[in-house]
């Protein structure tokens, strides 16, 4: 479902994902002022910056959904949208907007479902989201799901023939966040997409890419895992209420999302480093070295640079148990903070920022090689999920904006 963009301003309609700018209420206040008096997806969602007002806002949101579903949104049946998103840096990220089957999704660590979470799901974060979704008439996606398609067989062929497709929308995004242009995907292109996805999900493709004999992993949730987990939780509620057979035909069985190729050149993975406060720096380094020396895993050798004051030392881990250096670091910190409750861990974007923080008293920085894109799927398959706060996918201004809607009742 989309509004008629001949009558509705796309720039005012589309707003960024609710989990962005959570500590910057002034951003959201500016959005409120900018969209005042216009049809906007801001009316249909709850920014996390306003969670302290959720009891008042949720009924308003649900009422807006009913009004918009009846008087603003137009239905486009059986449609998929090819999206070209010009980011704030000028690069174009390409994606497909469509539905995934929640029967094929399991957010639990160690799952062997076709759709899996990339990071551990915090179960406590699901009930509040389910409460919002339970009475919602429509959904909007900020979920971004990744496919591992190095040969670019699914999305990129559409880009080469996009001009032959009907344009769904074409407008600038608010707050200097770039531009979006969407196209309705034709039936013949849909067939090509499904065929290419079938090949990616084959056992042969899994063995060739990852060197493992494991259940196929086609879709890895990059952004919005807790939203997708909430959709799954509500769908499970509905199944219990109406029975499995009836649930197979219920619209809540599916969830709207954007599918992006992991290998899209506009998609950046930025490592998230660690700063540890309130520790004796020398003892911390000694404890970390002892921990690493006792590991007996079979992952490839890793290196972690420990920085504090004006010193640094690179610790080599010959036999790590985690596929990623960040996993080794996080496993150590989980153990360390249990025996050192005074230690506080923070998750830091940027090497320079980490080094600067580590100059502080009783503070240590931990730097390591970021995860390459090629490691994402293999790590989820082998380790069950990535360590928390492994990587960031781009800046807030380049996250998904709410544009498309879908009925779930």
PLM features per residue range, with description:
Residues 199-242:
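Active-site beta-strand/loop microenvironment that shapes enzyme catalytic pockets
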Residues 137, 185, 189, 219-226:
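Short, contiguous, pocket-lining structural segments
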Residues 146, 221-222, 258, 367-368:
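Short beta-strand segments
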Residues 1-176, 205-208, 216, 362, ...:
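N-terminal extension/subdomain marker
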Residues 159-185, 264, 269-294:
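Compact, glycine/acidic-enriched structural inserts
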Residues 225-288:
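Catalytic or ion-translocation cores adjacent to nucleophile or general acid/base/metal-coordination motifs
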Residues 173-195, 317-321:
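Glycine-rich phosphate-binding "P-loop"
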Residues 276-390:
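C-terminal catalytic or substrate-handling cores of phosphate/nucleotide-
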